[in-house]
Amino acid sequence: MVSSWRVQQAAREIRAGAVIAYPTEAVWGLGCDPWNEEAVDRLLAIKSRSVDKGLILIADNIHQFDFLFEDFPDTWIDRMSSTWPGPNTWLVPHQNLLPEWVTGVHDTVALRVSDHPLVRELCSLVGPLISTSANPQGRPAARTRLRIEQYFRGQLDLVLSGSLGGRKNPSLIRDLATGKVVRPS
């Protein structure tokens, strides 16, 4: 895949510790490198979000999460694979393989393989990314670039231009072990 210059620029910024905004399937998201504690701390401060809540990781394909799945039953892998890429987020046991600034106080981590072309292109270059809705805590998620500018004027390192994916609601969240819906779409 030949990546566009704007996605390549976003990838370079993320590798350097940037916090960026980007379009997703339904709303704008904020993201950064999940392994960069300073970047995650900045993202949480920008959102006024507690580290205890945990964050979603998004990826280009399921194999970007393979390091988490080593001891998972095949039925779990099949369950996730059947819904990805797409607007389905799964809460999966993280087995202490991720930093606490990603998982918060939870035994699980939220994972999604996006079907948004820009997100997939970006993740193909940098690997899994933090993804959280682009809004200060308690405010509606941004659905326009203008709202991004209003919410975060001067606080973001880059806004990756693009269109939302056309979904009205954020992704469905389910618990992988039980299949129960935690948040409807």
From Swiss-Prot:
As for family, the record states: Belongs to the SUA5 family. TsaC subfamily.
| Primary localization class, coarse | cytoplasm
User: tRNA processing: present as a keyword of the record?
Assistant: yes
Q: What class of enzyme is it?
A: transferase
Name the source's superkingdom.
Answer: Bacteria
Domain YrdC-like as annotated: residue spans? 4-185
Name of the protein in question = Threonylcarbamoyl-AMP synthase
Gene Ontology cellular component list = cytoplasm
- One GO biological process term: tRNA threonylcarbamoyladenosine modification
Query: What UniProt keywords apply to this chain's record, in alphabetical order?
Result: ATP-binding, Cytoplasm, Nucleotide-binding, Nucleotidyltransferase, Transferase, tRNA processing
Q: What is its EC number?
A: 2.7.7.87
Q: State the organism's lineage.
A: Bacteria, Pseudomonadati, Pseudomonadota, Gammaproteobacteria, Pseudomonadales
Q: Name one GO molecular function term.
A: L-threonylcarbamoyladenylate synthase
The answer to whether the entry has keyword tRNA processing is yes
Catalyses: L-threonine + hydrogencarbonate + ATP = L-threonylcarbamoyladenylate + diphosphate + H2O
One Pfam family this sequence matches: Sua5_yciO_yrdC
